[in-house]
Amino acid sequence: CILPYNRVVRDLNGLTVKAFLGALKFNFELMLMPGFPCKPVEKHCMGMYVDGQWYHLKAWPDVYEKKDVVGQLDVSILQEKVLSPVLGIEDPRTDQRISFVGGSHKAAELAELADKTGGVAFVMYPTSMEDLMKIADESKLMPPKSTWFEPKLRSGLFIHKL
């Protein structure tokens, strides 16, 4: 089963919460979801937790190129429209301010992590098997930490006959 690979960023890159939310409005429809974790139910949507509040984010249709199989992934949209330009995370592989949390963890755990540092948590919509196969068929690479698979298989369990 493919689950999302969620993100927690330790700070807002020097921005106030108001300025951070304002920057997101250029690329996303933001809806405050008071009182409960927001888990996305469709592609191009994500949940976000910042400053004690949950938000539902939906990417505006012109934010991503529909024919770009990698660029239209939610993890790509987040990286290109939020993490890099707003939060200053150019390389998520090496930036110490970002953590990746597997989809088997509850949204409340992400909120707790964000609260500890005054940061922000993103609950992603999982990459579909269809998108995964399209990317493989086109010999393209997915962004880092795009998918979380459950159950985890033990190392050495797969044997392929040559």
List the predicted regions and their residue ranges.
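Surface-exposed, charge/polar-rich loops and edge strands
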Residues: 1-162
